[in-house]
């Protein structure tokens, strides 16, 4: 199985400019355990059912990146690359392609024309501390939801009330998804000013670790950029949606490709389509 794992600041062997319409497509995917990968393969039909089980059909030729930032830098340094990231993390180092004619934007997620959308969830145990519950109340308040919107994500409660601090004190450890982490850090920054009695630390891993570590008790609050699975909630945790986020399909800025269909994305990531000429001709 020809899998390359990229964990540094990009693919050093790739060419950063030029690109060719007949070049081989460099497929870049996230690692197993990534909530973004889980949502991506589901939304594009890359996950198929075989013998009663769901199977990830991502091509074995895909290079595997272990975080949002590595995915972006890897695509930015390979003119023939294609990958996917949180819409809220998109910047001008890469180009998001239209999907089925719809641009990847917050407005299009809101109006329903851009359909590649997933939830941002926090994960809570049944015995969450008072401090953890206070931070959750902040996230779901008008104050927290405004921070979510201001950072390019879609709030889930536009009619929320203003935050009111409790008497709780202590430390809260939040960990999990590298897609949720950027907006969580913004929330923590603002929360630290709204309530000086509670310290919140953020640890960036992946969605699956966010769930399992909350189950184990090493995280007070987990982060998952996907819905929780039945076997996860059966372990005594629950997911709470704090925001919605699009998944942007990204290519190098030098790429001539500006738009793909859902079927074309599936064909590329399952390895059926391997050359850009099959897309651009």
Show the residue positions of the predicted features.
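C-terminal motif of bacterial Sec signal peptides marking the signal peptidase cleavage site
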Residues: 4-8
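Exported/periplasmic ABC-transporter solute-binding proteins
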Residues: 9-281
